[in-house]
Amino acid sequence: MAVKQFKAESKRLLDLMINSIYTNKEIFLRELISNASDAIDKRYYRSLTDENISFNKKDFYIRIIPNKEERTLTIIDTGIGMSVEELENNLGTIAKSGSLAFKNKMESKEGIDIIGQFGVGFYSAFMIADKIVVKSHSIDSDEAYKWESKGVEGYEIEKCEKDELGTEIILKIKENTDDENYDEFLEEYNIKNLIKKYSNFIKYPIKMNMKKTKLKEGTKDEYEDYFEDETLNSMVPIWKKNKNEVKTEDYERFYIDKHFGYDKPLKSIRSKVEGVVSYTALLFIPSTTPYDFYTRNFEKGLELYSNGVLIMEKCADLLPDYFSFVQGLVDSEDLSLNISRELLQHDRQLKLIAKNIKEKIKSELLSILKNKREDYIKFYNNFGRQLKYGVYSDFGANKEVLQDLIMFYSSTEKKLVTLDEYVSRMKDDQKYIYYAPGENIDKIEKLPQTEIVRDKGYEILYFADEVDEFAIKMLMNYKEKEFKSVYSKDLGFEAEEKEEQKENDENKEVFEFMKDVLNGKVKEVRASKRLKSHPVCLANASDISIEMEKVLSMMPNNENIKADKILEINTNHNMFNTIKSAFKDDKDKLKMLSSLLYNQALLIEGLPIEDPVQFANDVCKLIK
């Protein structure tokens, strides 16, 4: 029979189908299995309106037959089959979909969920096959026909022998090249894995005659090979089962089987939404942190299914970065896929699903916080930093979403507390939410700057994570209460500020002299009423704090960003009498004391001093 040319487009179009639309060769099997499932669906829907067509679900299946000797891979279905006209129209015309036409014809009926809608998935098989043979026996025909093609050269159609209804696709697998190993598509183990990966939830059994080994009868140590049909897919997704049928252990097993994590999840969340866009989500909050979570190598995203067929392993658009720790999947019939079924069109359906998922995750986290505090603390120790990054990123666009989820260590409660809990305990005369940043809890406890706030009986939040202060500066306030660092020049204590101003006026010349000695290292030297037992400390003179300076200094291209500092002197400390005496009688000694006290303040903050040798010499002079 003469070779026919493809009706639509040209050699270039077919090349595009094979080489450009699909980015992953292995998805050809997903496409052919989805087509086979569609064919069985069509037979079922026809049986609903045609009493001459029988349909017993247990008799319908998809069979996979690899043959290494002949280098063929065969996919057989027991579906509706194709007539000669349908072979011509559906396979002879690129991008013509029989499934789409059938769906349009039946769209008034409920329950139609045909997967294939574009008519190009079939051609993905040319990525791994030199030749494709399709034998099909239509339910509407007494004769069977064969469609055969080697790709761009065109195709042939002729009658053939095939008694059973349905379609048989025979792929002649390409020979290996230096760059490509096509043998893998003939290996039973690999085929089984591909079906588990992409087509595990096709609702009809996918069978393959598998080679197995058993103990030879009558022997103790001799084994023999045998072949047995094995169903490779589980068919019914766990998220489509009745909730009453699924136990917590089932979700936990699914979580581990899918390699979402190696331990039981902290929380399993199942959500079914119907409306403008309908979908089912099965989400998991991990109980442990992935080893690469806080690295660039970590890839966020949920598995995305269309009618139970995996179309994307990591759909990043479904999760905001601050919830990137969430694992799981989404299955929807309403997705607008592009013609390769590999990629999504970025439309409002996807955005709406993502918005709903974000709200669901927040709701579940708040529920855990309220009802299972210990579980939330465990979660927060693993992923709290990510939530705080979320507050800081995008110029604070998500701060209102996350502000009730973040926690900090409390000076009075000696544990992690929420901002809401802090505000609920604020004293009547307290204006601000006070916080103290530092390297760790133990060091923050000893900071001189916290003394006056403690004496007032005010609770202090400890910021021991590098992102904490950046997040709070973006948050700015909570329930109309501003945040105030214990390093701030103004702590909001009016009585102490008046006394402080008096001390500054009385000792103005001393402080100006010390500032000049330090030669630009500080913006100001002044009296301090925040100090009780310590002689000296540093305070912030600008929005860039001392702790932020440390963080920024470790970043690439930091441009040597420095915090503007204030050196504060405790005028009630004995050291200040020595300072005043030196100012009056020994200016050289005061120069040494100024440098010494400044370096002491730097060491308290964990900042490097410029000249350690000179500092050591000054200490020795003071001892003498």
UniProtKB/Swiss-Prot annotation:
Main location: cytoplasm
Record keywords: ATP-binding, Chaperone, Cytoplasm, Nucleotide-binding, Stress response
Signal peptide: none
Molecular function GO labels: ATP binding; ATP hydrolysis activity; ATP-dependent protein folding chaperone; unfolded protein binding
Domain of life: Bacteria
Cellular compartments annotated: Cytoplasm
SUPFAM superfamilies on file: ATPase domain of HSP90 chaperone/DNA topoisomerase II/histidine kinase, HSP90 C-terminal domain, Ribosomal protein S5 domain 2-like
Segments for region (C): 551-624
Subunit note: Homodimer.
Role this protein plays: Molecular chaperone. Has ATPase activity.
Name used for this protein in its record: Chaperone protein HtpG
Species assigned in the record: Clostridium tetani (strain Massachusetts / E88)
